[in-house]
UniProtKB/Swiss-Prot annotation:
One annotated GO biological process: lipid A biosynthetic process
Keyword vocabulary terms for this entry: Acyltransferase, Lipid A biosynthesis, Lipid biosynthesis, Lipid metabolism, Repeat, Transferase
PANTHER family linked to this entry: UDP-3-O-ACYLGLUCOSAMINE N-ACYLTRANSFERASE, UDP-3-O-ACYLGLUCOSAMINE N-ACYLTRANSFERASE 1, MITOCHONDRIAL-RELATED
PROSITE patterns: HEXAPEP_TRANSFERASES
Name assigned to this protein: UDP-3-O-acylglucosamine N-acyltransferase
Enzyme class: transferase
Gene name of the encoded protein: lpxD
Organism: Aliivibrio fischeri (strain ATCC 700601 / ES114)
GO molecular function, one term: N-acyltransferase activity
């Protein structure tokens, strides 16, 4: 269990202590379930009423909310950011691996840095490079000439194919596959002819990738994920895709081949993005968005029909099928009015 005084935590968070800085906290809790030894946070004023009954040893709040608190306080401009930093300081998540397991296979010509941990039954193939402080979880596969950067963590059963490069301080969750073949085929009179995927996948620094996500290698050029990108679970990123730095992509999204997504974009869950298009910087696509064409102006975009009762939806669907007929009738009426 991690333990830290409020004064020490305030220094890490760049926060101001209001109350007893010697109080020790050891865990994060929600406001409704917090008890002595816990720290919680308030980032939305509509939950302010819960501060009266909160039993936490400390609360992270904005300065405007201090007067409503019954406990010690850490004052920050952004309490939600404070929550994230406090959670890091008190994190007790175990490491993917703690040393080099005897059951791990490591090729003789693989390069293993200082302080590397490799879990049971992991495979490190010829000329792969595992940089200082990297952690490779149990059952991982690191292909020939692949590179894993400093302090990067791979949880169990991650597959990194040949020549893939992953930068520093990245985190990849279990079951993810990086560098598998892109979906590339030619057609010879009805017979599919496989196109070997000759590119690779290049991932920058501080990238996080969720569980069971697949990132395909490029057909000729590389698939590129720039630094500081966060990618959720069960996402498909096809060959030759480029994702700009600082972008975020929620679960279940599919990005077709050769699409370029700009910097600081946010892609909502379950979105589908067509291939061979470009999305400019600063675009937000809400959940279940279907992007069929390029987006060259930043902003928020949505598609699809919001939730309705089944009865309402059936009526809407029926009307959609009649749009062409209604359009013809409307044009006929307009023509009569003009004549």
């Amino acid at each position: 269990m991690s333990r830290i005084t409020l004064a020490e935590l305030a220094e890490k968070l760049d926060a101001t202590v209001h109350g007893d800085g010697t109080v020790v906290v050891h865990s994060i809790a929600s406001m409704s379930k917090a008890k002595e030894g816990d720290i919680t946070f308030l980032s939305d004023a509509k939950y302010r009423k819960h501060l009266v009954e909160c039993q936490a040893s400390a609360v992270i709040v904005k300065e405007a909310d201090v007067e409503f608190c019954q406990s010690n306080v850490l004052i920050m401009r952004d309490p939600y950011l404070g929550f994230a930093l406090a959670a890091q300081a008190l994190d007790t998540t175990p490491a993917p691996a703690s040393d080099i397991a005897p059951s791990a296979y490591i090729a003789d010509d693989a390069i293993i840095g200082e302080g590397v941990a490799i879990g049971h039954n992991a495979v490190i193939e010829s000329k792969a490079v595992i940089a200082d402080g990297a952690m490779i979880g149990a059952g991982c596969f690191i292909g020939k000439e692949a590179k894993i950067g400093k302090n990067t963590k791979l949880w169990a059963n991650v597959s990194v194919y040949h020549r893939v490069e992953i930068g520093e301080a990245c985190l990849v969750q279990s079951g993810t596959v990086i560098g598998s073949d892109g979906f590339g085929y030619a057609n010879d009179r009805g017979t599919w002819v496989k196109i070997p995927q000759l590119g690779s996948v290049i991932i920058g620094d501080n990238v996080e990738i969720g569980a069971n996500t697949t990132i395909d290698r490029g057909a000729i050029d590389d698939t590129v994920i720039e630094s500081n990108v966060i990618i959720d679970n069960q996402i498909q990123i096809a060959h030759n895709v480029q994702i700009g730095s600082g972008s975020a992509m929620a679960g279940g999204t599919i990005v077709a081949g050769s699409t370029k997504i700009g910097k600081h974009c946010i892609i909502g869950g379950g979105s589908v993005i067509n291939g061979h298009i470009e999305i400019t910087d600063g675009v937000t696509i809400t959940g279940m968005g279907m992007v069929m064409r390029a987006i060259d102006e930043k902003g928020m975009y949505s598609s699809g029909i919001p939730l309705q009762t089944n009865k309402e939806w059936r009526k809407t669907a029926a009307r959609v099928h009649k749009i062409d007929e209604m359009n013809k009738r409307l044009k006929a009426v307009e023509k009569k009015l003009v004549d």
